[in-house]
Regions:
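Surface-exposed amphipathic alpha-helical tracts and adjacent flexible/coil segments at the periphery
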Residues: 1-184
Protein backbone atom coordinates (compact mmCIF):
# COMPACT_ATOMS: atom_id res chain seq x y z
CA UNK A 1 0.00 0.00 0.00
CA UNK A 2 0.91 3.65 -0.34
CA UNK A 3 -0.60 4.84 2.93
CA UNK A 4 1.51 8.01 3.06
CA UNK A 5 0.79 8.90 -0.54
CA UNK A 6 -2.97 9.26 -0.61
CA UNK A 7 -4.85 11.96 -2.44
CA UNK A 8 -6.14 14.91 -0.42
CA UNK A 9 -9.74 14.95 0.77
CA UNK A 10 -11.78 17.56 -1.12
CA UNK A 11 -15.54 17.96 -0.85
CA UNK A 12 -15.94 21.38 -2.49
CA UNK A 13 -18.10 19.83 -5.25
CA UNK A 14 -20.39 18.22 -2.67
CA UNK A 15 -21.40 21.15 -0.45
CA UNK A 16 -25.15 20.59 -1.17
CA UNK A 17 -25.02 16.93 -0.09
CA UNK A 18 -23.11 17.82 3.06
CA UNK A 19 -25.51 20.61 4.05
CA UNK A 20 -28.54 18.42 3.22
CA UNK A 21 -27.06 15.70 5.46
CA UNK A 22 -27.09 18.17 8.35
CA UNK A 23 -23.37 18.89 8.45
CA UNK A 24 -22.96 22.40 9.81
CA UNK A 25 -19.30 22.40 10.75
CA UNK A 26 -16.40 21.78 8.39
CA UNK A 27 -12.84 20.96 9.42
CA UNK A 28 -9.95 21.42 7.05
CA UNK A 29 -6.69 19.57 7.23
CA UNK A 30 -4.27 22.23 8.41
CA UNK A 31 -1.54 20.26 10.16
CA UNK A 32 1.81 20.75 8.43
CA UNK A 33 0.22 23.11 5.90
CA UNK A 34 1.25 26.63 4.95
CA UNK A 35 -0.74 29.67 6.00
CA UNK A 36 -1.51 30.14 2.30
CA UNK A 37 -3.07 26.66 2.10
CA UNK A 38 -5.20 27.12 5.23
CA UNK A 39 -6.35 30.61 4.22
CA UNK A 40 -7.16 29.56 0.65
CA UNK A 41 -9.11 26.45 1.63
CA UNK A 42 -11.02 28.16 4.47
CA UNK A 43 -11.88 31.16 2.28
CA UNK A 44 -12.98 28.97 -0.65
CA UNK A 45 -15.20 26.68 1.45
CA UNK A 46 -16.71 29.70 3.24
CA UNK A 47 -17.55 31.32 -0.11
CA UNK A 48 -18.94 28.06 -1.54
CA UNK A 49 -21.18 27.50 1.49
CA UNK A 50 -22.40 31.11 1.48
CA UNK A 51 -23.03 31.00 -2.28
CA UNK A 52 -24.99 27.73 -1.98
CA UNK A 53 -27.13 29.04 0.89
CA UNK A 54 -27.79 32.27 -1.04
CA UNK A 55 -28.61 30.56 -4.34
CA UNK A 56 -27.68 27.02 -5.44
CA UNK A 57 -27.33 28.29 -9.03
CA UNK A 58 -24.68 30.77 -7.88
CA UNK A 59 -22.80 27.90 -6.21
CA UNK A 60 -22.88 25.86 -9.43
CA UNK A 61 -21.82 28.85 -11.55
CA UNK A 62 -18.82 29.50 -9.28
CA UNK A 63 -17.64 25.86 -9.19
CA UNK A 64 -14.73 26.44 -11.63
CA UNK A 65 -13.44 29.23 -9.37
CA UNK A 66 -13.68 27.04 -6.23
CA UNK A 67 -11.83 24.19 -7.94
CA UNK A 68 -9.16 26.54 -9.26
CA UNK A 69 -8.54 28.13 -5.86
CA UNK A 70 -8.27 24.78 -4.06
CA UNK A 71 -6.05 23.16 -6.68
CA UNK A 72 -3.64 26.09 -6.77
CA UNK A 73 -2.58 25.73 -3.14
CA UNK A 74 -2.07 22.01 -2.70
CA UNK A 75 0.55 19.39 -3.34
CA UNK A 76 -1.85 16.54 -4.04
CA UNK A 77 -4.66 15.40 -6.28
CA UNK A 78 -8.12 14.99 -4.72
CA UNK A 79 -10.49 12.28 -3.53
CA UNK A 80 -13.81 12.19 -1.65
CA UNK A 81 -12.36 9.63 0.75
CA UNK A 82 -14.97 7.55 2.59
CA UNK A 83 -17.86 9.98 2.06
CA UNK A 84 -19.42 7.88 -0.71
CA UNK A 85 -18.25 4.41 0.26
CA UNK A 86 -14.93 2.66 0.45
CA UNK A 87 -12.21 4.48 -1.51
CA UNK A 88 -10.86 2.69 -4.55
CA UNK A 89 -7.27 2.43 -5.69
CA UNK A 90 -7.95 5.72 -7.52
CA UNK A 91 -7.69 7.40 -4.10
CA UNK A 92 -3.97 6.64 -3.94
CA UNK A 93 -1.08 8.18 -5.84
CA UNK A 94 1.23 5.58 -7.31
CA UNK A 95 3.86 7.81 -8.86
CA UNK A 96 6.14 10.35 -7.24
CA UNK A 97 5.07 13.36 -9.31
CA UNK A 98 2.37 14.79 -7.03
CA UNK A 99 3.37 18.44 -6.74
CA UNK A 100 0.64 20.59 -8.29
CA UNK A 101 0.80 23.85 -6.31
CA UNK A 102 0.81 26.90 -8.60
CA UNK A 103 1.25 29.70 -6.04
CA UNK A 104 4.01 30.56 -3.61
CA UNK A 105 3.17 32.11 -0.24
CA UNK A 106 5.01 35.41 0.27
CA UNK A 107 3.64 36.67 3.58
CA UNK A 108 0.76 38.21 5.46
CA UNK A 109 0.10 41.89 6.13
CA UNK A 110 0.73 42.49 9.82
CA UNK A 111 0.52 46.25 10.12
CA UNK A 112 -0.02 49.42 8.10
CA UNK A 113 2.36 52.28 8.86
CA UNK A 114 2.81 55.53 6.93
CA UNK A 115 1.26 54.06 3.77
CA UNK A 116 3.52 50.99 3.83
CA UNK A 117 2.61 47.43 4.72
CA UNK A 118 4.63 45.41 7.22
CA UNK A 119 5.07 41.73 6.50
CA UNK A 120 7.12 38.83 7.74
CA UNK A 121 8.30 37.50 4.41
CA UNK A 122 8.19 33.74 3.69
CA UNK A 123 9.64 33.47 0.17
CA UNK A 124 11.79 35.74 -1.95
CA UNK A 125 10.21 38.46 -4.07
CA UNK A 126 11.55 41.61 -5.71
CA UNK A 127 10.67 45.19 -6.60
CA UNK A 128 8.85 45.25 -9.95
CA UNK A 129 7.46 41.75 -9.51
CA UNK A 130 3.72 41.15 -9.97
CA UNK A 131 2.16 39.46 -6.95
CA UNK A 132 -1.40 38.84 -5.78
CA UNK A 133 -3.24 40.10 -2.75
CA UNK A 134 -5.56 37.36 -1.52
CA UNK A 135 -8.54 38.96 0.21
CA UNK A 136 -10.96 37.22 2.60
CA UNK A 137 -13.99 38.02 0.40
CA UNK A 138 -12.64 35.92 -2.48
CA UNK A 139 -10.96 38.66 -4.51
CA UNK A 140 -7.45 38.17 -5.79
CA UNK A 141 -5.87 41.49 -6.75
CA UNK A 142 -2.74 41.58 -8.92
CA UNK A 143 -0.29 44.35 -7.98
CA UNK A 144 3.28 45.29 -8.77
CA UNK A 145 5.71 45.64 -5.87
CA UNK A 146 6.69 49.33 -5.93
CA UNK A 147 9.20 49.25 -3.07
CA UNK A 148 10.71 47.08 -0.34
CA UNK A 149 12.21 48.55 2.85
CA UNK A 150 13.94 47.02 5.85
CA UNK A 151 12.80 47.92 9.37
CA UNK A 152 15.13 50.93 9.41
CA UNK A 153 13.56 52.28 6.20
CA UNK A 154 16.45 51.39 3.88
CA UNK A 155 15.38 50.59 0.32
CA UNK A 156 15.95 47.02 -0.90
CA UNK A 157 15.69 45.48 -4.39
CA UNK A 158 14.47 42.11 -3.08
CA UNK A 159 13.48 40.28 0.07
CA UNK A 160 15.75 37.22 0.01
CA UNK A 161 15.65 36.02 3.64
CA UNK A 162 12.78 33.91 4.96
CA UNK A 163 11.02 35.44 7.96
CA UNK A 164 12.60 38.81 7.28
CA UNK A 165 10.45 41.61 8.66
CA UNK A 166 10.08 44.42 6.17
CA UNK A 167 7.79 47.06 4.75
CA UNK A 168 6.46 47.08 1.21
CA UNK A 169 4.83 49.63 -1.06
CA UNK A 170 2.20 48.11 -3.32
CA UNK A 171 0.68 51.31 -4.67
CA UNK A 172 -2.80 50.27 -3.55
CA UNK A 173 -4.79 49.96 -0.34
CA UNK A 174 -4.88 46.61 1.39
CA UNK A 175 -5.90 45.41 4.85
CA UNK A 176 -4.16 43.81 7.79
CA UNK A 177 -4.28 39.99 7.40
CA UNK A 178 -4.49 40.07 3.60
CA UNK A 179 -2.17 37.38 2.24
CA UNK A 180 0.41 37.87 -0.49
CA UNK A 181 1.19 35.17 -3.03
CA UNK A 182 2.92 34.80 -6.39
CA UNK A 183 1.74 32.72 -9.33
CA UNK A 184 4.40 30.28 -10.52
Amino acid sequence: TYIFNSKGLCMIEHIPEMIDAGIDSFKIEGRMKTALYVATVARTYRKAIDDYLEDPKKYEANMPWYRDQISNCTYRQFTTGFYFGKPSEESQIYDSNTYIREYTYLGIIGEIKDGLYRIEQRNKFSVGEVIEIMKPDGQNVAVTVKGIYDEEGNSMESAPHAQQKLFIDLGTEIQVYDLLRRAE
